[in-house]
Swiss-Prot record:
GO terms for biological process: proteolysis involved in protein catabolic process. The active site is at T6. Gene3D superfamilies: Glutamine Phosphoribosylpyrophosphate, subunit 1, domain 1. It catalyses: ATP-dependent cleavage of peptide bonds with broad specificity. It comes from Desulforudis audaxviator (strain MP104C). Its EC number is 3.4.25.2. Belongs to the peptidase T1B family. HslV subfamily. Keywords: Allosteric enzyme, Cytoplasm, Hydrolase, Metal-binding, Protease, Sodium, Threonine protease. Protease subunit of a proteasome-like degradation complex believed to be a general protein degrading machinery. This is ATP-dependent protease subunit HslV. NCBIfam families: ATP_dep_HslV, PRK05456.1.
Length: 177
């Protein structure tokens, strides 16, 4: 039985970074088992926020590993992300994990994947999960055409995604750094 997480969006704007995640957790067969899950974690002395989409158990294993990499690199987000991606790609156990991580501090927003990719979006906005494309489009439109702060853009983008994607709900958690 695999539990799946759904949608995360991150927005960097005017020196602030916000991550938002919906609360829905479902089984692979479309059954909703939890509506108010928290898919965001504060890490490294509350200076880093991380969110996940994909397998819940896999994401927790990756959060733990990433937190260790942050400690080793004394909070250097990029270095910790590259080290996790390298381990994820080369370690026989980690390679089987199915999740995507979005991590952020005040300086950067990064996507880390199991293929060894560490991606920093050009515009400081990224979204993953089943409603990721909807949340990304909404966040970019809001960033271009409003003066809303990062936290409001992230929340509203996820709200919009929840109205379009059946695997994303409107029980939204937001964390800001």
């Amino acid at each position: 039985m695999t539990f799946k997480g759904t949608t995360i969006v991150a927005v960097k704007r005017d020196g602030a970074v916000a991550l938002a995640g919906d609360g829905q957790v479902g089984l692979g067969n479309g059954i909703i088992v939890k509506r108010d899950a928290v898919k965001l974690r504060r890490l490294y002395k509350d200076r880093v926020v991380a969110g996940f989409a994909g397998s819940v158990a896999d994401a927790f294993a990756l959060f733990e590993r990433f937190e260790g990499k942050l400690e080793e690199s004394q909070g250097n987000l990029r270095r910790a992300a590259v080290q996790l991606a390298k381990d994820w790609r080369t370690d026989k156990y980690l390679r089987r994990l199915e999740a995507l991580l979005v991590v952020a501090d005040r300086e950067a927003v990064l996507l880390i994947s199991g293929g060894g990719e560490v991606i920093e979006p050009d515009d400081g906005i990224i979204a993953v999960g089943s409603g990721g494309a909807f949340a990304l489009a909404a966040a970019r439109a809001l960033a271009r055409h409003t003066a809303l702060p990062a936290v409001d853009i992230a929340r509203e983008a996820l709200q919009i995604a929840s109205q379009i994607c059946v695997h994303t709900n409107d029980r939204i958690t937001v964390e800001q750094v």
